[in-house]
Each structure stands twice: as C-alpha cells, then as structure tokens.
C-alpha cells in the first residue's frame, strides 16, 4: 500500500494499517527528496520509482487533509495508474442497511455511521465523527473529529466540516463549503459558504 503524504494524517493512516495487519506500506512525498524513510517505511519521490518498485497499477491511499488537495492528488494518482483503496478502521461502527461507501475513503477510529447513509469517493471521516441515518455526503469531503451530522443531512462535494461541528437534521450544505470548528448549522447553506459559530453564519 502506498500512502500519499508524510505528515500527521499519513501517520494516523499508518496506525490504522498496522491495526489492520497490512504487511507492506510505503509513502510518497515529491516535495522533500531528503526524506528517505518515514517511521521505518520507504519513501518514494517519483511515480517512476513507485512503478519500478511496486507495479504499474499500485494501490494507494491519500494521507493528507483538505478536500481540494485530496481531490487533486487522488486524481493525479489515478492518472498515473494507481488504484484507490479505502482505509476502514477496525474500531468503527457501521450501519447494517443500505449503506453506500465510495472508493478511496479514510474512515478513522471511533467513527459511527448509521444505516441509509451514502458517502462519496475520497472522503476523510475523522476520529469519532458521527453520521446519522439518511445522510448524504458528496465526494472528497472532510468531516473532522467529533463532528456530528444528524439525520437526512446532505453535504455537497469538497466541503469541510470542522471539529465538533453539528449539522442539524435535514440541513443541505452545498459544494466547497467550510464549516468552522464547534459550529451549529441550523439552516441550508449555498455552495462556497464559509460559516462559523452557533448558529453558524
């Protein structure tokens, strides 16, 4: 498995892969050619090196935050022949009925996802986030630690929900939005909205 990135989130992904007993893990960082090893694992600096050592169609996971960056790097890796893989923690709670999970996800430890939930491609659902029944989350969103999406919430693509934020039932949030940490979203938000506070505005 190739993890894109060598920062804090990449380290958390490494923890999850260790828990899942993934035998061989490598990292990719094309910005720091002096970094040859990350916590005992080889770091590649070019796609050519990855393909020579692994294969033309290498499995990868995005180990960085930020919805727009995750989207760009996911598409870049796919363009090079990479196969997006999901990292799904062994310590999370998934609903039983009509659950749709996209490709290339990071579902971290402590996450709770109810039944009738749809999560698009490339999303990061961070530690202890709680997603209730009927929620719909678009592609490449980031749901930060301890955020709560209540029943039938709809989130567009590449939207960021900050740590500890709460989105009330039935709320619709557009694409490319940013919801500040600890906010309470009480009304629908158009695409490209940036809000914070209680109520969020």
Predicted feature residues:
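Hydrophobic, well-ordered beta-alpha structural blocks that scaffold small-molecule cofactor pockets
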Residues: 1-54
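Cofactor-binding loop segments of dinucleotide-utilizing enzymes, especially the Rossmann-like FAD-
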Residues: 6, 29-30, 65, 89, ...
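Short alpha-helical
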Residues: 8-9, 68-69, 100, 184
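Short amphipathic alpha-helical segments
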Residues: 14-16, 72-76, 119, 191
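Conserved acidic residues
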Residues: 25, 58-59, 103
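Phosphate-bearing ligand-interacting subdomains
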Residues: 34-93
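Structural signal for interior beta-strand "rungs" in well-ordered beta-sheet cores
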Residues: 87-196, 200-201
